Amino acid sequence: MNAEAKPGDWLGKVRWDANGLVPVIAQDAATNDVLMFAWMNRDALAKTIELKRAVYYSRSRQRLWFKGEESGHVQHVHEVRLDCDEDVVLLKVEQVEGIACHTGRRSCFFQKFEGTVDDGEWVAVDPVLKDPEHIYK
């Protein structure tokens, strides 16, 4: 347990990294499929709990990122879990329109390794459900 956490200080229980971030996995609440990986800071996690909607922290834009703010592919949060080391958050979500990835796919994990260590490659195995050019206008 995080020694710095005080009773009632649920944000203090999380083991934030040196940049004040925690990795987050979004998982489909109905199927348990892994949809995506992202980051949260304290504000993002607090907003996620408050709104019951996934809010992440964009490291490239240095700001909160409300999932679906541009695409409409919102994630309604059904459950929030913290792993045994208290340094990874799991969101069980309902993915609006079934598209979590900016590539227009259901999951960001659409590339599968095939082959051997000597001749392997990453192959896209999941279909594009919607052309990203029609998602981000």
From Swiss-Prot:
What is this protein identified as? Phosphoribosyl-AMP cyclohydrolase
What InterPro entries has UniProt attached to this entry? Answer: PRA-CH, PRib_AMP_CycHydrolase_dom, PRib_AMP_CycHydrolase_sf
State its cofactor: Mg(2+); Zn(2+)
**Could you name the domain of life of the organism this protein comes from?**
Bacteria
Q: What does the record say about how the cofactor binds? A: Binds 1 Mg(2+) ion per subunit. Binds 1 zinc ion per subunit.
The record's PANTHER family line, in alphabetical order, gives: HISTIDINE BIOSYNTHESIS BIFUNCTIONAL PROTEIN, HISTIDINE BIOSYNTHESIS BIFUNCTIONAL PROTEIN HIS7
Localization in the cell = Cytoplasm
Q: Source gene? A: hisI
Q: Which UniProt keywords apply?
A: Amino-acid biosynthesis, Cytoplasm, Histidine biosynthesis, Hydrolase, Magnesium, Metal-binding, Zinc
**CC per GO annotation:** cytoplasm
Q: What GO biological process terms are annotated to this protein in UniProt?
A: L-histidine biosynthetic process
Which major enzyme category is it? hydrolase
Enzyme Commission number(s) from the entry: 3.5.4.19
Q: Which Pfam families match?
A: PRA-CH
Kindly list the GO molecular function terms attached to this UniProt entry.
magnesium ion binding; phosphoribosyl-AMP cyclohydrolase activity; zinc ion binding
Under the subunit heading, UniProt states: Homodimer.
Q: Which residues bind Zn(2+)?
A: 84, 101, 108
- Give the protein family: Belongs to the PRA-CH family.
What reaction(s) does this enzyme catalyze? 1-(5-phospho-beta-D-ribosyl)-5'-AMP + H2O = 1-(5-phospho-beta-D-ribosyl)-5-[(5-phospho-beta-D-ribosylamino)methylideneamino]imidazole-4-carboxamide
Q: What does this protein do?
A: Catalyzes the hydrolysis of the adenine ring of phosphoribosyl-AMP.
Q: In which pathway does it act?
A: Amino-acid biosynthesis; L-histidine biosynthesis; L-histidine from 5-phospho-alpha-D-ribose 1-diphosphate: step 3/9
Q: Which residues does the annotation say bind Mg(2+)? A: 83, 85, 87
